[in-house]
């Protein structure tokens, strides 16, 4: 069982960043060495901070150097929210908000890239047992953002050009309650019991692994 102190130690690595309060003698170079990251990432995550004039007591975001989006773990609504938060810290030009709430009150989070007039919308995890589309979309988001800051390309087109031309909206988990049911995060309680009652009418579909609908049994 993971206790509160263990979670507190793990959380920065799940979100991909930590924070640091500036002390006398701190520099971005020194902080990069201290946290095993690089100066570029620290500068990018703190766009309003002058690295030549660090103010004692200022709180800095310190992104780690590893890729944030895991692709070899089962996903949940919480993990998705942590990754969205981490991406917006690492790449502060990204915008994030919620388009609404799920049946169980979870935020339906989205990311916005770009400044263009042409609007494009991608989403993932409509069907609960197709949650694998969530890390696919989040990995795309991470690669796009990294390509933008490093002058790279996406599909043969400069990411900076795509950023200027399009406003891209990504909603990585349309059905968070259903995903939590399928991946085992939701395994008891009233919502779980009602979902099981619905599933009993379809014995040919394994429960919860085969569940596609939202937690109320409505196919999205």
Which residues does each predicted region cover?
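Short glycine- and acidic-rich boundary segments immediately preceding or forming the N-terminal edge
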Residues: 41, 63-104
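Short hydrophobic beta-strand that contains or immediately precedes a catalytic carboxylate
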Residues: 22, 121-124
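Short beta-strand-to-loop junctions in surface cap/lid or active-site-entrance loops
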Residues: 109-117, 125
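Short acidic beta-strand-loop surface patches of small beta-rich interaction domains
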Residues: 43-50
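Primarily a LysM-type cell-wall glycan-binding module
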Residues: 12-36, 58, 64-67
């Amino acid at each position: 069982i993971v206790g509160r102190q263990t979670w507190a130690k793990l959380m920065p690595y799940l979100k991909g960043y930590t924070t640091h309060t500036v002390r006398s003698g701190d520099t971005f170079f020194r902080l990069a060495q201290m946290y095993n990251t690089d100066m570029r990432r620290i500068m990018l995550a703190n766009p309003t901070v002058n690295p030549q004039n660090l103010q004692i007591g200022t709180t800095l975001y310190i992104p780690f150097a590893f890729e944030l989006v895991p692709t070899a773990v089962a996903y949940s609504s919480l993990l998705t929210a942590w990754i969205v938060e981490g991406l917006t810290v690492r790449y502060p030009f990204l915008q994030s908000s919620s388009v609404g709430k799920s049946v169980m009150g979870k935020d339906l989070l989205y990311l916005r890239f770009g400044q263009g007039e042409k609007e494009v919308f991608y989403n993932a995890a409509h069907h609960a047992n197709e949650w694998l589309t969530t890390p696919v979309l989040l990995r795309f988001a991470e690669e796009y953002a990294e390509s933008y800051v490093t002058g790279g390309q996406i599909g043969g087109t400069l990411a900076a050009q795509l950023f200027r031309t399009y406003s891209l909206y990504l909603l990585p988990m349309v059905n968070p309650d259903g995903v939590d049911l399928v991946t085992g995060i939701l395994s008891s309680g009233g919502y779980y019991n009602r979902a099981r009652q619905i599933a009993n009418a379809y014995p040919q579909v394994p429960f919860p692994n085969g569940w596609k609908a939202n937690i109320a049994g409505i196919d999205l």
